[in-house]
Amino acid sequence: GYNYINNNGYGIDDDTAYNGIFDGKGHSISGLFIETKKYNKQGDNHYETYCQGLFGIIGKEGTVRNVTVNGQINAQAEGNEYINAAKYIGGIAGINAGLIINCTNNADITGLAYVGGITGQLGAQFKGSNRVSGNLINVTNNGTVTATSKSFAEAGGIVGQLAYGDITYATNHGNVSAPFKDDDMYSYLRGVAVGGIVGKDISVSECGKIDRAYNDGQIGTEDGNYFGGIIGCNYACDITNVYNTGQGIGYNYSGGLVGYKLGGTIENAYNSGEVNTHTEYQLIGSMRNTTVNNLYNIGDSTKLVALENGGDISTVYAVDTVLASDLSDAFTDSYNLPVIDWSNAPTGEDETFDIESINIENGK
C-alpha cells in the first residue's frame, strides 16, 4: 500500500497515516507485489509514490504485529534528491511512527532514498505536532534491500533512516546495498550510507537507540561514503548489545560495526565479519568525540577504530574469540560465538503491551 504525502508545508498530514491495530495472528501475506513507474526527471513530483510498503505510513497511534510479508516491492526511480518519488520504502511500512512488533519481511525491496527491510524511516514529524518516535520490537528481515539514489541513499536491513525511535530485538539476514557508481562521485560527496540494521540516523539529539540486534547479511556500497555492519552513519543514537558476522564493502568510512560515528554510545558489541575497505578499520571507520566501551573484533587485524578529534578506545580489543560473559547478560554462548538471548523478546500477543517495559539498558 501507499500513502499520499501532501508536501505543502512542513511535516506529514496525520490523517494520511494508519492509526489502527493490525494483528496478523502469526499469518503470512504472500504475493505482495508493489511496482511504480520509473521516474527519473528532475523536479517531477510524484508524492503518491513517496511511501511504499504493506502500510505506507503507520501513525503515532498505529500498531502492526504478528505478520510476515512475502513478495516484492520495486519502487522505481533513479537520480538524486530532486526526483520526488519512491523515497520511503519498507517491507512493513514506508514510514513508521507507531509500533511494529513481532513482524518479518521476506520481500525483496528497491527504492530511491530511504529503504529498509522493515521500514524506510523510523519516526516522523507530523504537521502541527512535535516529533513522534516509532518503535520496532522483535523484527526480522530476510529480503534484499537496495537504494538507488546517487546522492543520498540510506539503506538498512531493518531501517533506512532512523529519525526518532528505538529498535529492540532486530535481525537482518538479507543483503543490503546502494550499488550506484558515478563518475562525478555524488555518492562519495553527499554520503550514501548502508548498514546491516540502519543506514543512517539523522538527529543530533533525541534519536533513540539500537539494542539487541545483529546482522549476518552482506552489506555493500562501492562508491558510498558510509558502510557499517550495524549502522553506516551514526550521529546520535545509542547502540548496545549488537554484533555483526556479515561481510561488507565500503569506499571511505567503513567498519564492521559503524562506518562513521559522531555521537551516541556503543558498547557490548563484536564483529567477526570481513570488512573490505581501503581504510582497513575493522570496527569503526571514523570516530569523533565519543566514547565506546567493550568492543571486540575477531580476527588478525589490529586496525580497529579510526580515532579523530577525541574519544576513548581503551576498551577495544582484537581477539581470537569472545564469550557471552565478556559482553553482557543480553548474550548467551552458542556453538561458535555468542548470540543474543531471544528468550525474553516480546511477542506482541498482549494488546496492553507497554513500550516502556522494554527500555532495557546495558543488558540488565
Regions found by a protein language model. Give the residues of each.
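Surface-exposed repetitive/solenoidal architectures
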Residues: 1-364
